[in-house]
Design a protein with these regions (language model features):
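Aromatic- and glycine-rich beta-strand/loop motifs that create alpha-glucan
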Residues: 1-28
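Membrane-helix interface segments
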Residues: 18-20, 112-114, 118, 154, ...
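Central hydrophobic cores of alpha-helical transmembrane segments
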Residues: 23-28, 189-200, 216-220
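Secretory targeting signals
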Residues: 26-93, 117-184, 198-210, 222-253
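Transmembrane helix boundary and interhelical loop/hinge segments in multi-pass membrane proteins
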Residues: 90-109, 113-114, 121
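Junction motif at the cytosolic side of a transmembrane helix
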Residues: 251-272
Length: 272
């Protein structure tokens, strides 16, 4: 089964499933709304700080948040906040196969377990690519609207953060897919996945890093989050990585492969 057919298979399964379409629409809406409202929020914040002469002067001197070169990393990091929405989409797409017994029917109809996994991976790839395209279009629009520099070299400098964001979404969705194959029930999977990725691992790595001085780059969520690093400290004259680090890509990519392998292992090992 080729990639086109696996994509078509997923499309026919969920094209009329309203919760799937609602979550997808919510992701696009939140993504665009947050990007388009940043300028208004900054203007509001500036107005609130008018009495603070030092901070007001610093802010009014110009933070190049929307300038080309800076905008790609800034938006890519902000957009990662919403990666849980497509993750829930993937969880639902997998767990629904178990609850409605469609996975068993697909296998009976001649679809191999490998092809079934590829159909889910094709959905992940499509969502990740569309997320990167959405980020590119939003960044291009905001940059052309607010950036004082609009020459072609400046526009495409640091464009690698768009691809990095796509990779971050892809690996995170692979993790969500593994969780869905592991627990098989949508409600349980969403709760446990959210708890681990948003609470348990971040708290654990913070304690290990700052109290015990451990290196935490090998934890899965930490590795995924490191692909696009927090950029805003540079506006307070602190050092930040203003480019995508190859080691971050390799570690996160390795986790993506691990999640795919574990998903396939679970699919092969368990009865349907």
């Amino acid at each position: 089964m080729n990639l086109t057919k696996t994509i078509q298979l997923e499309y026919y399964k969920f094209r009329h499933y309203k919760p799937f379409l609602v979550i997808l629409g919510l992701y696009v809406f939140c993504f665009l709304l947050s990007g388009l409202s940043i300028k208004s929020l900054l203007d509001w914040f500036l107005k609130q700080q008018e009495d603070d002469d030092v901070l007001s002067h610093f802010l009014k001197s110009g933070l190049p948040i929307f300038d080309f070169v800076d905008i790609w990393q800034n938006l890519a990091w902000l957009a990662t906040i919403f990666k849980w929405i497509p993750a829930f989409l993937i969880i639902i797409s997998v767990t629904l196969e178990y609850s409605q017994k469609t996975i068993k029917q697909n296998i009976i109809d001649g679809l191999s377990k490998k092809e079934f996994l590829l159909s889910k991976l094709s959905l992940i790839v499509v969502v990740s690519i569309c997320s990167a395209i959405l980020l590119f279009l939003l960044g291009l629009f905001l940059g052309l609207l607010y950036s004082p520099v609009k020459d072609i070299p400046s526009i495409f400098q640091n464009i690698s953060f768009v691809a990095a964001y796509g990779l971050e979404v892809l690996v995170f969705l692979c993790m969500a897919m593994f969780a869905a194959f592991l627990f098989q029930r949508s409600g349980v999977t969403i709760i446990l996945f959210l708890l681990y990725t948003a609470c348990i691992e971040p708290i654990l790595t913070t304690i290990l890093q700052y109290q015990y001085k451990w290196k935490v780059w090998f934890f899965p969520v930490e590795a995924i989050n490191r692909i696009v690093r927090v950029p805003f400290q540079k506006y307070a004259l602190r050092f930040v990585y203003d480019h995508v680090l190859i080691q971050d890509v390799l570690v996160a990519g390795a986790w993506g492969l691990i999640f795919i392998f574990l998903s396939y292992w679970l699919l092969k090992r368990r009865d349907l």
